[in-house]
């Protein structure tokens, strides 16, 4: 966003000064945006850093972290860094997070459960009722992290919203980021919100000065651009749905579409064929994730797709 770029440039001019370690202005801006209290919000060097901090405050050697798979690739890495044991749980046959299976995977050693919604890389969402049924059986001593990195691209109404569930459940913390819809991936800033006790614990293990002055300025300015954000995400959503229909991908609520493949080799071959056409997609063992941005780039992808499939 132009206002964010200008604010970051101004902040960069004072790069000889340390940033506000408490990110006070940013936290208050996020709290106002979410209609929460400042003590319910923590910021970090991207939401991925906050994921790592969640593992730090909940786990030690021998503890378990449960998460859907395939999902955000860093979840098992975060667990291992803390000495915890990753417990991946397969998705359903229709590429959705399997909440009953996640609940069944919880043991007395489980300290943290990640739920990525929309899920990365499949773009699928969970529904409100199944999340409440899931929470009804999750022990109150187990923390549930609702990872909403792609929240701004969601258009379905029947999916849990972090701002609602963290009020209803003290053992839920939600995560969002400025990297995706706001376009600030390069400056690294994300946020967590929920129970003030959880937020206080996150702050205790945060790296000092982890969110730069440039990142803080860009994030604050971005929050003021609600109309521009909606316009940007609406275009992405429209193009996402167009691409999904054109290639037969499954419906998505993120800024990408997921095309399942029968084999790892098929996914790798498809990614290479598209790369040869100047289009980069992400191959996984189970399929290909195709990021969608604007109309021009979607057209470029579809032209490359048609050249290798027709």
Specify the residue positions occupied by each region the protein language model found.
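N-terminal small-domain helix-loop-helix segment of the aminotransferase-like
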Residues: 1-48, 53
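PLP-dependent aminotransferase class I/II
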Residues: 4, 22, 171-250
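PLP-dependent aminotransferase-like
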Residues: 16, 24, 57-115
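Short glycine-rich anion-binding loops that position phosphate/pyrophosphate groups of nucleotides
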Residues: 47-48, 72, 117-121, 150-151, ...
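Active-site pre-lysine segment of PLP-dependent enzymes
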Residues: 80, 97-108, 121-144, 148-184
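Short beta-strands and strand-loop turn motifs
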Residues: 86-90, 112-118, 144-148, 250-252, ...
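Conserved PLP-binding catalytic core of the aspartate aminotransferase-like
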Residues: 237, 241-277, 286-288, 292-296
């Amino acid at each position: 966003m132009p206002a964010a770029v200008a604010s970051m440039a101004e902040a960069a001019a004072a790069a000889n000064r340390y940033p506000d370690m408490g990110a006070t202005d940013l936290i208050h801006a996020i709290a106002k945006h979410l209609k929460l209290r400042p003590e319910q919000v923590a910021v970090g060097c991207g939401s991925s850093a906050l994921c790592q901090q969640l593992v730090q405050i909940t786990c030690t050697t021998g503890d378990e972290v449960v998460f859907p798979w395939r999902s955000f690739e860093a979840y098992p890495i975060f667990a291992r860094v803390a000495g915890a044991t990753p417990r991946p749980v397969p998705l359903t046959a229709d590429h959705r997070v399997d909440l009953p299976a996640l609940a069944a995977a919880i043991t007395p050693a489980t300290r943290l459960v990640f739920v990525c919604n929309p899920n990365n890389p499949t773009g699928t969402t969970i529904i409100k009722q199944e999340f409440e049924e899931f929470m009804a059986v999750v022990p109150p001593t187990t923390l549930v992290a609702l990872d909403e990195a792609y929240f701004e691209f969601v258009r379905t109404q029947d999916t849990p919203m972090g701002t609602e569930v963290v009020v209803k459940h003290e053992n839920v913390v939600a995560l969002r980021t400025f990297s995706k819809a706001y376009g600030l991936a390069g400056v690294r800033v994300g946020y967590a919100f929920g129970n003030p006790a959880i937020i206080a614990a996150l702050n205790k293990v945060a790296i000092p000065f982890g969110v730069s002055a440039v990142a803080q300025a860009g994030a604050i300015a971005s929050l003021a651009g609600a109309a521009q954000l909606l316009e940007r995400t609406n275009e992405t959503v429209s193009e996402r749905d167009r691409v999904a229909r054109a290639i037969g991908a499954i419906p998505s609520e993120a800024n990408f579409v997921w095309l399942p493949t029968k084999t790892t080799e098929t996914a790798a071959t498809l990614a290479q064929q598209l790369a040869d056409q100047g289009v980069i997609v992400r191959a996984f063992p189970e399929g290909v994730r195709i990021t969608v941005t604007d109309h021009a780039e979607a057209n470029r992808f579809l032209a490359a797709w048609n050249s290798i499939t027709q």
